[in-house]
A protein has these predicted regions:
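Short, basic/low-complexity N-terminal boundary segments at the transition from targeting/disordered tails
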Residues: 59-70, 141-150, 307
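Rieske [2Fe-2S] iron-sulfur-binding domain
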Residues: 76-181, 185-196
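A near-ubiquitous, low-amplitude feature marking generic local secondary-structure context
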Residues: 38, 42, 54, 151, ...
């Protein structure tokens, strides 16, 4: 049986990610040298969190209606009048480029009868409800009410009939919204995460393609699968030659966490020795009928070749 360790002390056989970095030929950004392990407990998590309507409703109330959440990229709404429809749970929001340097967001529902104002992303010069035609400027002010003589009470309300505004913040080209008017400042929510990306200029990147897949599972099941490398041994055994699955480092901060899994190094779970050529071939997805793409100099490693850019 395995040795019994103190809470948070358990780790895999083989070297740690930090020890692996110590053997590398290239220095890494300081942020990759940070370590923030936290023991969050080992009590069982009830299946109800993944399967019940009651728990879903709790998340809608306490999470999706109160937390800062990524809605779209700025380059998806580059021109004035461009808008993006962001749906989460039963809620829908219009994220609008209302001026060259301003992004606003509104609930995607007409104030008259609640009909969705926009069904798809696009560009518009006004926001007109497709049901009765109540219309707002893209900046949210009331523009027109058909048969306004029958709605004197709305005319009197004036700015009261403005589309409700949802809080918006941007960081590195990402657009975030928060439906809670009393939410914490975005800067506090982001915390130190921006520091982790100082070496990666995400603001000047763009999304070339958007690929989505509907998965028949609770959202947490899907997200958790991409927050660990524990499944590699059973699900992706073909990449174990070049992936240090259990060498992974897991770090947890207040509002974000990260998992770092090293490539071009064999899994400690393998029960046989792997050559550097085998590691390189696996890392470069070389077929059995193909020659090794390059020669590894004597004394070098596949990981060093990868760090040098091939």
């Amino acid at each position: 049986m395995s040795e019994i360790l103190s809470p948070g002390e358990a780790r895999s056989p083989g070297i740690s990610y930090q020890e692996l970095l110590d053997t590398d030929t290239h220095e890494v950004p300081e942020v990759l040298r940070l370590e923030s392990p936290r023991f969050l407990g080992d009590d069982d998590i009830s299946i109800t969190r993944y399967t019940t309507r009651e728990w879903h409703d709790i998340e809608v109330e306490k999470l999706w209606s109160r937390v800062w959440q990524y809605a779209c990229r700025e380059e998806e709404i580059p021109e004035v009048g461009d808008y993006y429809v962001y749906d989460i749970a039963k809620a829908s929001y219009i994220v609008m480029r209302s001026a060259p340097d301003e992004i606003q967001a509104y609930p995607n529902a007409c104030l008259h009868r609640g009909r969705r104002l926009k069904d798809y992303d696009g560009n518009c010069s006004e926001i007109r409800c497709p049901f009765h035609g109540h219309c707002w400027e893209i900046s949210g002010e009331l523009k027109d009410i058909p048969a306004s003589w029958d709605f004197p009470h709305l005319e009197e309300r004036g700015s009261d009939y403005h589309l409700p505004e949802i809080q918006v913040a941007t960081w590195a080209g990402f657009v975030f919204i928060n439906p809670d008017p009393d939410c914490e400042p975005f800067e506090d929510f982001l915390g130190d995460m921006a520091d982790h990306f100082e070496g990666w200029d995400l603001a000047n990147r763009y999304k070339q393609a958007h690929i989505a897949k509907v998965i028949d599972c609770n959202w947490k099941i899907s997200q958790e699968a991409f927050s660990e490398a524990y499944h590699v041994n059973a699900t992706h055994p073909n990449i174990m030659l070049q992936l240090g699955d259990t060498n992974s480092q897991v770090d947890i901060w207040d509002n974000f966490s990260r998992v770092i899994t090293a490539g071009a190094t064999p899994s400690p779970n393998l029960d046989y020795e792997v050559t550097e050529e085998e590691i390189l071939r696996c890392a470069m997805d070389t077929r059995h009928d193909q020659d090794t793409p390059m020669e590894i100099p004597s004394g070098s490693t596949a990981r060093a070749i990868a760090a040098a850019g091939g």
